[in-house]
Amino acid sequence: MRGKRFKKTANSFMKNVVILICSQLLIKVLGLIYKLVITNIEGFGDTGLGYYSAGYQIYSLLLTLSSIGIPSVISKLVSERIAIGDTKGAQRIFKVAFRFFTTLGLVLSIGLYFGSDFIATNILNVPDVAYVMKVLSPAIVFVAMSAVFRGYFSGQQNMKPTSVSQTLEQFLNCVLSITFVYACIGKDTYIMAAAGNLSTTFAIVLTFIYLFIYYKKRKLDTSKSIESPEKNKTNKQLLKTILGISIPITVSSLISVISGVIDTATVSNCMQIAYSGIESSKEALEQIAMSATGILSKVDTLVSFPLAINLAFSTALVPAISEALAKKDKETASRRLSFSFFASLIIVLPCAIGFISLAQPILSMIYPTASDGAGVFQIASVSMILTALSQTMTGGLYGVNQSKIPAIAAGIGAVIKFILNMILISNPNINIYGASISSFVYQVIVFIICYRVLNSHVNMHIKLKTHIIKPVISAVGMGIIVYMGYNIIHMFLGNTISTLLAICLGAISYVLLILFTKTLSKEDIMMIPYGTKIYSFLVKFKIYKEVKEPLR
């Protein structure tokens, strides 16, 4: 009976994960396409990408204040109310949150518009970035409202509107970015960057309209709601509850975003310091700083692919664990968390090793006119492993009401990162690599703190041989095959074909190595959609032996 119940909840959890993975993959592909196109447009390049991302980082900082913590919080509170049948309470949580965060988003939108000149001139030391921030400012209020909708639907274990809206937003952003930047060819680079970011605002407004229409058609049915003690809370008390959970999450996310802002500000200033003895022109120094910022942005775009897949586990984990704990089902919560941690490692390890093995070929293939940054890419790929695992553990910590821990961990990491950035980037022999090195140290700190706390609350059942050593052996073996394969193929074919064939070779070899090492148990395979059919196929071809005993 317990096995059947777990299998049912596992299937529901994995269904949401698969929906989010498909959505996130499509979003990242679209994001890569438009960044690839605009980066290779004449007059844009790494410098244009630097202006583009510098303004976007400041925008992201305010965006985090107004919206980043909202989906997780609303999702958690709504799922807890629905789990006990209190649909009226769930609906009330949505309404209180919507009013407050709409107001907050509006205030921050106005603040960014009128404060952009000061930030660009006095903090970033690149005045022209102000244009990018101004065109992004109206988007903040619409993102805040959209975030409440997404949390509301996520709390109902309905990931469809979140997936569709995010995909729609990125599609519109992709089409409009390319269109607007092309329309500005011949103008100054910062104008082209501002035009590219203007598309983000248009896309977000249209996405909000979609979510609003969906909400009007799919509101919760409150006619059969069960009364709970929550009904006696005033709106002020309810808002206090929402903020009590959302503030630690927001602070954690804010510090993570600050990590990016630290890079933007310190790279912009420290690169100018590092090269001040080589270049005397202020304009030339700004161009060097923006080019370095562009390289970081370019690398972030690539490493975000595996992280987007992994984020699906983290996002689905919050309501899944909250629901299980609300029902006093610690076993299910533990299994979901353990599987998500293991799955994160299985997904991100081969990607990291593949990126390290093919760093320069990948950059040359995707950014033929701006292919610098292979070393930065390799260091970021190592950090990506820890980032992915920290994402999953953060979702678990939110689910077990330990939302302050990621904030504390990120805060400690951010302070150390800032100090390292100032020391390393200002050294002309290290320069931009300093940002990647400090990011790695930052992720190590966050990972260690989050893991220790989460494991003390929920037994994660991490087995060294099965969950760590076997995936590492498979990923390293794949990396060797990919590296050798690329170099052999490249003797006869060009870079693009050689890189694509090496990636295909890597994917096939990794799957075979995973099967050969028996990294996935029967229970792991059963968690995957169509797991029963996959396992039967593996048994039929004697890759796995039939296991008769029931699931634990």
PLM ranges: what are they?
Residues M1-R2, F180-C184, F202-K231, F440-H490, ...:
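C-terminal transmembrane helix end/exit motif
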Residues R2, Q272, M484-R552:
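Membrane-proximal transmembrane or re-entrant/amphipathic helices at the cytosolic face
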Residues N11-S72, S109, Y113, A139-I140, ...:
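Signature of the first transmembrane helix
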Residues D117-L136, M290, G354-M384:
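Interfacial segments at transmembrane-helix termini and the short loops linking adjacent helices
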Residues V143-S165, V382-I412:
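Membrane-interface junctions at transmembrane-helix termini in multi-pass inner-membrane proteins
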